[in-house]
């Protein structure tokens, strides 16, 4: 985690907290994959599992923030904030099918399902409720950015 600056740690903490909906202090390995992919990291399932097994030092199958930050640092060390923002904006634009500056929670649900088909409807509801802070049923770019970068 030493290779991350304060801003990166803060962004990772916010992303971690967004998916740690029960505030248990850990996320699942599947969720790690979702967060990394939403941040623009291209990683195969096999490589992800390998990195997670190396990172999950206590072998709990649950990824605590420290473990998550160390894992993410391996991928973020080459990224800077501007590149991350650009990648997120591009990802958002692709899913903003109407070009009107927002995606519906239904589209976000589809994205999350694509990233991890093991998410249950309850998991998806919790994640979406956390992201769609104003309850509008839509996610604008600022809500999306806030979730991903703080």
From Swiss-Prot:
<feature type="domain" description="EF-hand 3">
    <location>
        <begin position="83"/>
        <end position="118"/>
    </location>
</feature>
<keyword id="KW-0677">Repeat</keyword>
<protein>
    <recommendedName>
        <fullName>Troponin C, isotype alpha</fullName>
    </recommendedName>
</protein>
<dbReference type="GO" id="GO:0016460">
    <property type="term" value="C:myosin II complex"/>
</dbReference>
<keyword id="KW-0514">Muscle protein</keyword>
<feature type="binding site">
    <location>
        <position position="62"/>
    </location>
    <ligand>
        <name>Ca(2+) 1</name>
    </ligand>
</feature>
<feature type="binding site">
    <location>
        <position position="143"/>
    </location>
    <ligand>
        <name>Ca(2+) 2</name>
    </ligand>
</feature>
<feature type="binding site">
    <location>
        <position position="136"/>
    </location>
    <ligand>
        <name>Ca(2+) 2</name>
    </ligand>
</feature>
<dbReference type="InterPro" id="IPR018247">
    <property type="entry name" value="EF_Hand_1_Ca_BS"/>
</dbReference>
<feature type="binding site">
    <location>
        <position position="134"/>
    </location>
    <ligand>
        <name>Ca(2+) 2</name>
    </ligand>
</feature>
<keyword id="KW-0479">Metal-binding</keyword>
<dbReference type="InterPro" id="IPR011992">
    <property type="entry name" value="EF-hand-dom_pair"/>
</dbReference>
<keyword id="KW-0007">Acetylation</keyword>
<dbReference type="Pfam" id="PF13499">
    <property type="entry name" value="EF-hand_7"/>
</dbReference>
<feature type="binding site">
    <location>
        <position position="138"/>
    </location>
    <ligand>
        <name>Ca(2+) 2</name>
    </ligand>
</feature>
<feature type="domain" description="EF-hand 4">
    <location>
        <begin position="119"/>
        <end position="150"/>
    </location>
</feature>
<dbReference type="InterPro" id="IPR050230">
    <property type="entry name" value="CALM/Myosin/TropC-like"/>
</dbReference>
<feature type="binding site">
    <location>
        <position position="67"/>
    </location>
    <ligand>
        <name>Ca(2+) 1</name>
    </ligand>
</feature>
<comment type="similarity">
    <text>Belongs to the troponin C family.</text>
</comment>
<feature type="binding site">
    <location>
        <position position="56"/>
    </location>
    <ligand>
        <name>Ca(2+) 1</name>
    </ligand>
</feature>
<keyword id="KW-0106">Calcium</keyword>
<comment type="function">
    <text>Troponin is the central regulatory protein of striated muscle contraction. Tn consists of three components: Tn-I which is the inhibitor of actomyosin ATPase, Tn-T which contains the binding site for tropomyosin and Tn-C. The binding of calcium to Tn-C abolishes the inhibitory action of Tn on actin filaments.</text>
</comment>
<feature type="binding site">
    <location>
        <position position="60"/>
    </location>
    <ligand>
        <name>Ca(2+) 1</name>
    </ligand>
</feature>
<dbReference type="InterPro" id="IPR002048">
    <property type="entry name" value="EF_hand_dom"/>
</dbReference>
<feature type="binding site">
    <location>
        <position position="58"/>
    </location>
    <ligand>
        <name>Ca(2+) 1</name>
    </ligand>
</feature>
<feature type="domain" description="EF-hand 2">
    <location>
        <begin position="43"/>
        <end position="78"/>
    </location>
</feature>
<feature type="modified residue" description="N-acetylmethionine">
    <location>
        <position position="1"/>
    </location>
</feature>
<dbReference type="GO" id="GO:0005509">
    <property type="term" value="F:calcium ion binding"/>
</dbReference>
<feature type="binding site">
    <location>
        <position position="132"/>
    </location>
    <ligand>
        <name>Ca(2+) 2</name>
    </ligand>
</feature>
<feature type="domain" description="EF-hand 1">
    <location>
        <begin position="7"/>
        <end position="42"/>
    </location>
</feature>
């Amino acid at each position: 985690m030493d290779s991350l600056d304060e801003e990166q740690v803060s962004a990772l903490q916010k992303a971690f907290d967004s998916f740690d909906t029960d505030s248990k202090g850990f996320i699942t390995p599947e969720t790690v994959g979702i967060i990394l992919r939403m941040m623009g990291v291209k990683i195969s399932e096999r490589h992800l599992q390998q990195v997670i097994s190396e990172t999950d030092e206590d072998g709990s199958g649950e990824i605590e923030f420290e473990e998550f930050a160390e894992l993410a640092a391996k991928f973020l060390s080459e990224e800077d904030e501007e590149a991350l923002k650009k990648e997120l904006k591009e990802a958002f634009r692709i899913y903003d099918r109407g070009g009107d500056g927002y995606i519906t929670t239904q589209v976000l649900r589809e994205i999350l399902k694509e990233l991890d088909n093991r998410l249950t409807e309850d998991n998806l509801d919790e994640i979406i409720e956390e992201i769609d802070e104003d309850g509008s049923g839509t996610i604008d770019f600022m809500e999306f950015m806030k979730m991903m970068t703080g």
